């Protein structure tokens, strides 16, 4: 059995979606002064590797704590969408073999984490999102800043997926290892467990895959 960390590190100055709160992590208490070390965290609900609840794009849709835990864990299908150029659309053809469950889209864009190029990621088209919903997919993850283009005036892929009460995971990492494992015939299981934030639009996660 192999465990793969699919998360980016949470640290001061890390990349965030344009307009989101900047992240800072620093000491609130120290052993020298207070007898214990405690960190103070300042971050948004969409910081780092995180999940979006449907409420993220529509006030009428379920919030994070209203979703079943099954949305955040289970067997995953990994779609290899690597090799695309900046801001390339990922259409329905990429998901022709997908049937239900959790789908992770490996664009390879996590290699740009921390650089300006990270915002020029490939994205899901509205038609691709609609096909995933039609196929019964209720959790979609990407190794990019968003399932929609960045920046965006609208969020069509978000709206289609969230409208079906699907969960979206963004800023995943190391999906290439999952592509290799799946090609070798190994099962891929993932855990995308968010902080239990009441009434939230989303939350950071420690995303982990188990191969075997």
Which residue ranges define each predicted feature?
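Active-/binding-site microenvironments in catalytic and ligand-binding cores
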Residues: 1-212
């Amino acid at each position: 059995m192999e465990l793969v960390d699919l998360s980016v590190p949470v640290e001061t100055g890390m990349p965030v979606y344009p307009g989101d709160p900047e992240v800072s992590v620093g000491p609130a208490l120290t052993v020298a002064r207070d007898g214990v070390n405690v960190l103070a965290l300042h971050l948004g609900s969409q910081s780092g590797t995180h999940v979006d609840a449907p409420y993220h794009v529509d006030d009428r849709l379920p919030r994070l704590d209203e979703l079943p835990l099954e949305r955040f864990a289970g067997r995953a299908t990994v779609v290899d969408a690597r090799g695309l150029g900046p801001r390339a659309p990922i259409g329905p053809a990429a998901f022709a073999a997908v049937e239900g469950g959790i789908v992770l889209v490996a664009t390879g864009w996590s290699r740009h984490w921390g650089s300006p190029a990270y915002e020029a990621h490939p994205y899901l088209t509205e038609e691709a999102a609609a096909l995933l919903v039609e196929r019964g997919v209720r959790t979609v993850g990407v190794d990019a800043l968003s399932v929609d283009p960045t920046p965006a005036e609208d969020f069509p892929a978000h709206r289609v997926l969230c409208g079906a009460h699907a969960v979206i995971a963004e800023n995943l990492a190391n999906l290439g290892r999952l592509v290799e494992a799946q090609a070798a015939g190994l099962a891929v299981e993932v855990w995308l467990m968010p902080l239990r934030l009441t009434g939230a639009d989303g939350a950071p996660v420690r995303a982990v895959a188990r191969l075997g």
